[in-house]
C-alpha cells in the first residue's frame, strides 16, 4: 500500500468510526444537548468537569459556551471545574480524590 492509499484508508476508517459513534451515541448526545438548553433557558449554568484529557474537552466546551463559537452571540453561563489545580489538590488532600468535583458541584451548582 502506497502513502496515498494509506491516507485514503485512514479517511475511510474515520468515516466508519463516525458512523458507528453516531449510531451508538446520537440519541444520548441529543438528550444531553436538550438538557443543556433547558438548563440555560431556566437561567441555570452548565458545569463541566473531567480528568486528564477529558478535562481538556470539558474546558473546550466551556470556552465555546463563554465565547462565541461559530456565530456572534452573548456569552452563555458555563464553568469548568477541572481547570483549578490548586482547589483540586486541596480537596484531594483533605477529603479524598473522589470528592474533587463533588465538593465543587455542591458549592457552586445551584
Question: How would you name each of these model-derived features?
Answer:
Residues 1-110:
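Conserved N-terminal alpha-helical segment that immediately precedes and caps sugar-phosphate-binding
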Amino acid at each position: 500500500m502506497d502513502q496515498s492509499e494509506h491516507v485514503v484508508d485512514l479517511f475511510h476508517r474515520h468515516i466508519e468510526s463516525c458512523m458507528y459513534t453516531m449510531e451508538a451515541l446520537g440519541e444520548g448526545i441529543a438528550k444531553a444537548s436538550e438538557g443543556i438548553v433547558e438548563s440555560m433557558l431556566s437561567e441555570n449554568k452548565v458545569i463541566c468537569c473531567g480528568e486528564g484529557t477529558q478535562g481538556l474537552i470539558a474546558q473546550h466546551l466551556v470556552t465555546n459556551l463563554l465565547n462565541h463559537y461559530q456565530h456572534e452571540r452573548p456569552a452563555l453561563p458555563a464553568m469548568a471545574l477541572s481547570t483549578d489545580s490548586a482547589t483540586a489538590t486541596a480537596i484531594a488532600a483533605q477529603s479524598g480524590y473522589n470528592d474533587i468535583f463533588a465538593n465543587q458541584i455542591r458549592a457552586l451548582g445551584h
